Amino acid sequence: MAKGQSLQDPFLNALRRERVPVSIYLVNGIKLQGQVESFDQFVILLKNTVSQMVYKHAISTVVPSRPFNVGSHQGGSSNYNAQQDDSAGEQ
Protein backbone atom coordinates (compact mmCIF):
# COMPACT_ATOMS: atom_id res chain seq x y z
CA MET A 1 0.00 0.00 0.00
CA ALA A 2 2.99 2.33 0.43
CA LYS A 3 3.17 2.75 -3.35
CA GLY A 4 -0.35 4.25 -3.32
CA GLN A 5 0.86 6.93 -0.92
CA SER A 6 3.72 8.07 -3.19
CA LEU A 7 1.73 10.99 -4.64
CA GLN A 8 -0.63 11.75 -1.78
CA ASP A 9 1.96 12.26 0.96
CA PRO A 10 4.26 14.70 -0.91
CA PHE A 11 1.20 16.65 -2.12
CA LEU A 12 -0.27 17.03 1.38
CA ASN A 13 3.15 17.66 2.93
CA ALA A 14 3.87 20.51 0.49
CA LEU A 15 0.46 22.03 1.26
CA ARG A 16 1.27 21.82 4.96
CA ARG A 17 4.84 23.10 4.65
CA GLU A 18 3.95 26.09 2.45
CA ARG A 19 0.74 26.82 4.40
CA VAL A 20 -1.30 26.85 1.18
CA PRO A 21 -5.00 27.60 1.78
CA VAL A 22 -7.12 24.72 0.47
CA SER A 23 -10.74 23.89 -0.21
CA ILE A 24 -11.63 20.32 0.67
CA TYR A 25 -14.81 18.93 -0.86
CA LEU A 26 -16.41 16.01 0.91
CA VAL A 27 -18.26 13.19 -0.83
CA ASN A 28 -21.55 14.62 0.50
CA GLY A 29 -20.86 17.96 -1.22
CA ILE A 30 -19.80 19.98 1.83
CA LYS A 31 -16.90 22.38 1.24
CA LEU A 32 -14.34 22.92 4.00
CA GLN A 33 -11.63 25.58 3.84
CA GLY A 34 -8.42 26.07 5.76
CA GLN A 35 -4.79 24.99 5.86
CA VAL A 36 -3.44 21.48 6.25
CA GLU A 37 -2.01 21.40 9.74
CA SER A 38 -1.14 17.70 9.80
CA PHE A 39 -2.12 14.37 8.25
CA ASP A 40 -1.63 10.66 8.56
CA GLN A 41 -2.78 7.55 6.73
CA PHE A 42 -6.45 8.09 7.60
CA VAL A 43 -7.12 11.76 8.48
CA ILE A 44 -6.22 15.35 7.60
CA LEU A 45 -6.17 17.98 10.33
CA LEU A 46 -7.56 21.15 8.75
CA LYS A 47 -7.04 24.46 10.55
CA ASN A 48 -9.16 27.58 10.07
CA THR A 49 -10.75 29.39 13.01
CA VAL A 50 -10.91 25.93 14.60
CA SER A 51 -9.12 22.66 13.85
CA GLN A 52 -11.14 19.90 12.20
CA MET A 53 -10.14 16.27 11.82
CA VAL A 54 -11.39 15.13 8.42
CA TYR A 55 -11.36 11.44 7.54
CA LYS A 56 -9.78 10.83 4.13
CA HIS A 57 -12.48 8.35 3.12
CA ALA A 58 -14.97 11.25 3.31
CA ILE A 59 -12.91 13.49 0.97
CA SER A 60 -13.72 13.83 -2.71
CA THR A 61 -11.28 16.57 -3.77
CA VAL A 62 -8.52 18.77 -2.35
CA VAL A 63 -8.17 22.08 -4.22
CA PRO A 64 -5.21 24.38 -3.45
CA SER A 65 -5.94 28.10 -3.77
CA ARG A 66 -2.58 28.90 -5.37
CA PRO A 67 0.33 27.20 -7.15
CA PHE A 68 2.93 25.50 -4.96
CA ASN A 69 6.00 23.28 -5.32
CA VAL A 70 5.76 19.58 -4.60
CA GLY A 71 9.17 18.12 -3.71
CA SER A 72 10.01 14.89 -5.48
CA HIS A 73 11.50 11.89 -3.69
CA GLN A 74 14.21 11.86 -6.39
CA GLY A 75 15.64 15.20 -5.30
CA GLY A 76 13.89 17.33 -7.92
CA SER A 77 10.70 19.29 -7.60
CA SER A 78 7.59 19.76 -9.60
CA ASN A 79 5.18 22.65 -9.63
CA TYR A 80 1.47 22.15 -9.06
CA ASN A 81 -0.42 24.99 -10.70
CA ALA A 82 -3.95 25.43 -9.40
CA GLN A 83 -5.92 26.37 -12.50
CA GLN A 84 -8.61 28.99 -12.08
CA ASP A 85 -11.54 28.40 -14.43
CA ASP A 86 -13.15 31.80 -15.07
CA SER A 87 -16.05 30.14 -16.86
CA ALA A 88 -17.06 28.04 -13.84
CA GLY A 89 -20.64 28.70 -12.91
CA GLU A 90 -21.42 30.57 -16.13
CA GLN A 91 -23.98 28.84 -18.32
Swiss-Prot record:
Domain of life: Bacteria
MF-aspect GO terms: RNA binding
Similarity annotation: Belongs to the Hfq family.
Keywords from the named record: RNA-binding, Stress response
BP term (GO), one: regulation of translation, ncRNA-mediated
Name of the protein: RNA-binding protein Hfq
Composition skew (Polar residues), residue ranges: 71-91
NCBIfam families: Hfq, PRK00395.1
UniProt subunit comment: Homohexamer.
Lineage, opening ranks: Bacteria, Pseudomonadati, Pseudomonadota, Gammaproteobacteria, Alteromonadales
